[in-house]
Amino acid sequence: MTSTQRTLMVMAGGTGGHVFPGLAVAHRMQAQGWRVVWLGSPAGMEATLVPRHGIPMEYVRFGGLRGKGLATKFALPFNLLRACAQSLRALRRVKPDVVLGMGGYITFPAGLVTVLTGRPLVLHEQNSIAGLTNKVLAKLAKRVLVAFPGALPNAEWTGNPIRTELARTEPPQARYAARSGKLRLLVVGGSLGAAALNEVVPRALALLAPDERPQVVHQAGAKHIDTLKENYEAAGLSCGSDVALVPFIDDMASAYANADLVICRSGAMTVAEIAAVGVAALFVPFPHAVDDHQTTNAEFLAEQGAAVLVQQRDLSAELLADWLRGQSRDSLAAMAERSRSLAKPDATDEVARVCAAVAGANLEGKQ
């Protein structure tokens, strides 16, 4: 670290919805010569993922504020004090010019200590319904940023930071116009598999006449591939040229761009990525998400005719098959264009610029 080099500390942990947008901003700041240090949990995915990106880690142990039983509630004051002490030591070691809170349990104690020690705090809320931590810290932060308008009062709508390649895909009008033949369907179950999608989609496709069936790429997580294959075979559909089952997709930008339609959950990052690429989507929100935030995430696009929202309790093979019969490449292209129009492709740059401004620095151009 040089004497003039600025330092950003990113606080984020727990799930990819917090970690991946944090990484996007971290890389943007590094490209501008900033030193970046990450504050996370040793038990979260960030502990293995972030160091692979060449970003040093500091650790805080904290399990959260929401009730998880009587013993956890009794231990909360001790755990919070311990986490605050760990956060204080980390801040003293790193001496950041600005701290960016991207969510996760550790953001609460670390955010409190950031403010109490006089360091500037920038918050970013990824979901359409703010989590408890950000609701509290938003009253103390220098700047508050949101991915969805209205998620927090008096916040700036920047969108969700995403990977650069997602924002650089060809416009949907050109992509869809260049295609012919069967529709292309991408089903994204994520690492957990989305059992409801794995069960309903094969049965829905079986209800379609062979010439009505789209070409399918179905991602389901390594643990669920065998069961998914059995579901397709039970529906009388063999996996081959028109049905490809994959455990993981490395290049999501290309996967989205090559699809006419995506069927998936509606986590904050998924919604942001689909809008950035510009692809038609049928969202089935995870019904047990905290505060049902996946429903309101999906509504942001669905209420503008930029996606379709179906609750899991309403999803059936018959409903899905009937809806698919009514779709054409033109109708899906129109949906994709509306989705793209609602995207915030410069979100990573905007969040980075805010961090730099709060630290009293300038950030050059776009990446």
From Swiss-Prot:
HAMAP family: MurG. The gene is murG. Pathway: Cell wall biogenesis; peptidoglycan biosynthesis. GO terms for biological process: carbohydrate metabolic process; cell division; cell wall organization; lipid glycosylation; peptidoglycan biosynthetic process; regulation of cell shape. Belongs to the glycosyltransferase 28 family. MurG subfamily. Gene3D superfamilies: Glycogen Phosphorylase B (3.40.50.2000). Transmembrane segments: none annotated. Cell wall formation. Catalyzes the transfer of a GlcNAc subunit on undecaprenyl-pyrophosphoryl-MurNAc-pentapeptide (lipid intermediate I) to form undecaprenyl-pyrophosphoryl-MurNAc-(pentapeptide)GlcNAc (lipid intermediate II). It is an enzyme of class 2 (transferase). This is UDP-N-acetylglucosamine--N-acetylmuramyl-(pentapeptide) pyrophosphoryl-undecaprenol N-acetylglucosamine transferase. It catalyses: di-trans,octa-cis-undecaprenyl diphospho-N-acetyl-alpha-D-muramoyl-L-alanyl-D-glutamyl-meso-2,6-diaminopimeloyl-D-alanyl-D-alanine + UDP-N-acetyl-alpha-D-glucosamine = di-trans,octa-cis-undecaprenyl diphospho-[N-acetyl-alpha-D-glucosaminyl-(1->4)]-N-acetyl-alpha-D-muramoyl-L-alanyl-D-glutamyl-meso-2,6-diaminopimeloyl-D-alanyl-D-alanine + UDP + H(+). It holds the Pfam family Glyco_tran_28_C. Keywords: Cell cycle, Cell division, Cell inner membrane, Cell membrane, Cell shape, Cell wall biogenesis/degradation, Glycosyltransferase, Membrane, Peptidoglycan synthesis, Transferase. UDP-N-acetyl-alpha-D-glucosamine binds at T15, G16, G17, N127, R163, S191, I249, Q294. It is a peripheral membrane protein. It comes from Burkholderia pseudomallei (strain 1106a). GO terms for molecular function: UDP-N-acetyl-D-glucosamine:N-acetylmuramoyl-L-alanyl-D-glutamyl-meso-2,6-diaminopimelyl-D-alanyl-D-alanine-diphosphoundecaprenol 4-beta-N-acetylglucosaminlytransferase activity; undecaprenyldiphospho-muramoylpentapeptide beta-N-acetylglucosaminyltransferase activity. The keyword Protease does not apply. Its main location: membrane. Its EC number is 2.4.1.227. One of its GO terms (cellular component) is plasma membrane. It is found in: Cell inner membrane.
